[in-house]
Amino acid sequence: MVTVFDRYFGYHILSGMLESIPCQPSDNYCTVAKCSGHCRCNAACVVINFNTVTGVCQLHDASVLNNNATVEGNVTDWVILEPQNGAPKFGEWTVVFRATAGINQPALEEYMNSTRRDDQYTIVNNVPAGCLSLNGSIPCDRHYRTRHLETWDHWGVSQVLLGLYKDGDMVGNVTFDCNGCSFTSWFHYNHVIASSWNDLTAPNTTYNIFGIEGYRTRHFVINDVYGGCPNDQGWLMVVDQTGGDGCPWENGTSSFPYILTTRTGTRTNWTYGNPVVVDVMAIMVKL
């Protein structure tokens, strides 16, 4: 089966060449299909250069979408082929990040980790099935991360959906407008256009923290009040370290991340409001 590619006609990538394979007509090497076969057999290969005239096949370990890649244009004989990503899709939404609760890996650290590409076709078959699902009862050993976070501007993201799941059921969500935003700036109250939390977009609603970096070990925070631990209240909190910042409501488990959200359609008191501990936080984009 031929791998499906994103194709960039008239371009030739110069960075990170692994191998250049000349055309051998007698062995039927002068096809894109054969060239893609070489790439599939090389775990480091992420991009193919193919010369449509000579049939030369070049394998590279640098994505055409990386900012540090060197690419020449207006070369009519060449085409760059990058295998399309294997990120899961749910309707019109594509998953770009899936935080898994309780695996003792900080969610924010992996979100910002530019070396992680779980959707790369050379490794996607080794990703546990649970990581491609929104159901936390199916085992997943990582925070699933795709190349979309590094190539955000290229994809033209229009909206972002943050979904929170417990045993496969969505228990909370926020939709953000993302025209002109980056992979970090979308998470801001000015971009919110819809939410399952009725008071999140109310005219009189205020936030003491609304941001991915949050506060100390609390990340992906949408919070209303820090008034001393018993008075803290908000909508979303990802505690990225055992024990968090020391409040009793952060100590519900010995493992992290500890992902908390409100059980109702409004903000909750983290101590007395009986918040939901979710097992999956998914960040999805509409392209």
Regions picked out by a protein language model, each given a short descriptive name:
Residues M1-P88:
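Extracellular disulfide-rich cysteine clusters
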Residues Q84-L287:
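Mature extracellular or lumenal effector domains of secreted proteins
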